[in-house]
Amino acid sequence: INKYREWKNKKN
């Protein structure tokens, strides 16, 4: 899962 990783980075 890296879509969540990208989203988490954008969310932060």
From Swiss-Prot:
Keyword Cell membrane part of the UniProt annotation: no
GO molecular function, one term: toxin activity
Superkingdom as given in the UniProt entry: Eukaryota
Keyword Transmembrane: no
Tissues showing expression: Expressed by the venom gland.
Main localisation: secreted
One cellular component (GO) term of this entry: extracellular region
Keywords: Secreted, Toxin
Location relative to the cell: Secreted
Similarity field: Belongs to the cationic peptide 04 (cupiennin) family. 06 subfamily.
Protein's name according to its UniProt entry: Short cationic peptide-6d
Species of provenance: Cupiennius salei
Species classification: Eukaryota, Metazoa, Ecdysozoa, Arthropoda, Chelicerata
